[in-house]
Structure formats: structure tokens, C-alpha cells
């Protein structure tokens, strides 16, 4: 349907159809993220020997995140007197918008994708980098030393780990021969790339956690060091924008890992009778659980260790993986 609309001539009818689809995607993602956050809190509670949210919405706390969202929306919108007001207001939007833009190219099944473009992987990597600008802008505009330090840390961390992240997927691109995410999934029909590219998978997973600013790489918003990092001065719905962008990216990155290394919607061996959407959901949930497990298990590392690990360990290994993949492809394929 969407491909047909893209090829059809411009008209107000098509505009309103696209606008309606965009609003539908927005609410679908927000609803998913709302209960994704609840699921993370329940899993973390289980791992730490706690019950987790259980007061709002019955014994399972099903409406806890909804109540949190309403609380944030009803809070006063305060802007510090010394802040750069235009940039302070703009920063959450800059951080929030790309998170939804990248979801457009993720193929959830062979028939469900909002935009099937030839360079979907390149688009995802390029657009996701815009978030760094929003984070740094928020830290600078707050006119607060903790916010500024958090913004600087975020910029250094994201730039440092963006390089091994990109280099780790070059092996996948070499094997698939395409930047189109649908074609990458199709190329994994027989062998998933987690087996063909184990080194690339490990590098991508580590770099993805660093890109998401999640434990053990959550230095930009280290509560024990920087109060709340780059969003120290933010409250209410503006703070919610930063949090939403973080969680939308979290689920977006989990989807990308599923597509690049776990075969997307491709079934396991003789279980092809199970729908592709179910396979995608199972693989996606496994990646999400793994990242939550990381958050509960690992302590935060120091800033110097973070930089050293990225530049001295991940980068050379990622480069070696590219040469090894190219050599194997040239000799055996």
C-alpha cells in the first residue's frame, strides 16, 4: 500500500493518508514503549528479588507507566532563567524525532514495513546520529555544569562507538551484497549472520549498548556523578521526550539486531508453519531481554575505560573482521 502511495502523484488525499499513517505509527510505538518500559521494570524487579510495579492497574501494575506519563504531562513546564531558551526547547525535539524516523525502514515482516528503501541500513545509521545533536544541545542550553558534562560525555561516547558500530555491519553488507534490510533478511534464509558473523555480532551488540547510553555505558546520565546528566534541568513533558527517545531507540536497535544477525522473520529449521511476525517477535524479545540483563548485571565503567575499550579494542577487531570477511568471501564464495 505504502509503495503504491509513494509512486502515485501528489495530492491532498495522499497527504492525509500519509499523515494518518504517521499518527497511527506514533500511537502504536508510544503504546508499545509504554508497556515495554513496564516489562523492563518487572523483569528488573524479578532479577533483583523485588515485585516491581503492582499498585496501579491491578496486581500486575498494568497502568503504572500510563500513570507515570500522565504525571509527567501534568507537571509544570519550568525553564531555568539562565538557560538558552530557544535551544532548551528545541533540544528534546531534536533528540526525539530521529527515534521515530528510523523505525520507518525496519522490516518487521516481509509484508509489514513503512518504507522499503534501497539503502535502509545507511539511512538508519545516518538518522540515528542526529540524536547526538539534541543531547549536546540540551546539555549546553541548560547552562548547568552537570548537564554540560553529561552532554560532552554523550558526544564523545556516541562518536567513539559509532565507528565500530558501522564497521561491524560492513561484514553483513559484504555477505548480503546489499544495504537493503529486506534483502539482508532474505540472504539469511539458510544461515543467520550471528553464525556467519559472530565477531561482528558481538561488536555490534557492545557498540549498540554504548550508543543507547545504557548500563554499563550510561556515563552521560550517571545519577551518582552528574545528578541526571544532560537532562538534569528538564522536567515534565520535555524530560519525557528524552526518555521516550531513549526507549524508542532501545526497541529500534533491538529490531535492527534482529534483522541484521537473527534472520528477521525467517523461521528456525522445520518450523516454517509459524508466522514470520511471531518469529520476529520472539527474536526481538530475546534481544530486549539480553539488554535488560546487561543493565541489571553490570556496573558502570569509568570514562577512560570506555574510551580505551572503544578505540583500542573494538575498532581494531572490527577492522580485522572486515578484512577476514572480505578474504573469506573472495576465496570461498
Swiss-Prot record:
Catalytic activity: a quinone + NADH + 5 H(+)(in) = a quinol + NAD(+) + 4 H(+)(out)
Membrane association type: Multi-pass membrane protein
Primary residence: membrane
Subcellular location: Cell membrane
Database matches in Pfam families: NADHdh (PF00146)
Family: Belongs to the complex I subunit 1 family.
Entry protein name: NADH-quinone oxidoreductase subunit H
Amino acid at each position: 500500500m505504502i509503495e503504491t502511495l509513494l509512486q502515485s502523484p501528489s495530492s491532498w488525499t495522499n497527504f492525509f493518508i500519509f499523515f494518518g499513517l504517521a499518527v497511527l505509527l506514533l500511537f502504536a510505538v508510544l503504546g508499545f514503549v509504554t508497556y515495554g518500559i513496564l516489562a523492563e521494570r518487572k523483569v528488573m524487579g524479578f532479577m533483583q528479588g523485588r515485585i516491581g510495579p503492582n499498585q496501579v492497574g491491578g496486581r500486575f501494575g498494568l497502568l503504572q507507566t500510563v500513570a507515570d506519563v500522565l504525571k509527567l504531562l501534568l507537571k509544570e513546564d519550568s525553564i531555568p532563567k539562565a538557560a538558552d531558551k530557544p535551544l532548551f526547547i528545541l533540544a528534546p525535539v531534536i533528540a526525539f524525532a530521529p527515534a521515530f524516523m528510523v523505525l520507518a525502514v525496519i522490516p518487521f515482516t516481509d509484508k509489514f514495513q513503512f518504507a522499503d528503501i534501497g539503502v535502509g541500513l545507511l539511512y538508519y545509521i545516518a538518522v540515528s546520529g542526529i540524536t547526538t545533536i539534541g543531547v549536546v544541545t540540551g546539555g549546553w542550553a541548560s547552562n548547568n555544569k552537570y548537564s554540560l558534562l553529561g552532554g560532552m560525555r554523550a558526544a564523545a561516547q556516541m562518536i567513539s562507538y559509532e565507528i565500530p558500530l558501522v564497521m561491524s555491519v560492513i561484514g553483513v553488507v559484504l555477505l548480503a551484497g546489499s544495504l537493503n534490510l529486506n534483502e539482508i533478511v532474505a540472504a539469511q534464509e539458510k544461515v543467520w549472520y550471528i553464525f556467519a558473523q559472530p565477531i561482528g555480532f558481538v561488536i555490534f551488540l557492545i557498540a549498540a549498548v554504548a550508543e543507547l547510553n545504557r548500563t554499563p555505558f550510561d556515563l552521560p546520565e550517571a545519577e551518582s556523578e552528574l545528578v541526571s546528566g544532560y537532562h538534569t534541568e528538564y522536567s515534565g513533558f520535555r524530560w519525557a521526550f528524552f526518555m521516550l527517545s531513549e526507549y524508542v531507540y532501545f526497541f529500534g536497535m533491538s529490531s535492527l539486531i534482529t534483522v541484521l544477525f537473527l534472520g528477521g522473520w525467517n523461521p528456525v529449521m522445520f518450523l516454517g508453519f509459524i508466522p514470520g511476525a511471531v518469529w520476529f517477535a520472539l527474536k526481538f524479545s530475546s534481544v530486549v531481554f539480553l539488554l535488560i540483563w546487561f543493565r541489571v548485571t553490570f556496573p558502570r565503567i569509568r570514562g577512560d575505560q570506555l574510551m580505551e575499550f572503544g578505540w583500542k579494542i573494538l575498532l581494531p577487531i572490527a577492522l580485522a573482521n572486515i578484512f577476514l570477511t572480505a578474504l573469506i568471501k573472495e576465496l570461498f564464495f
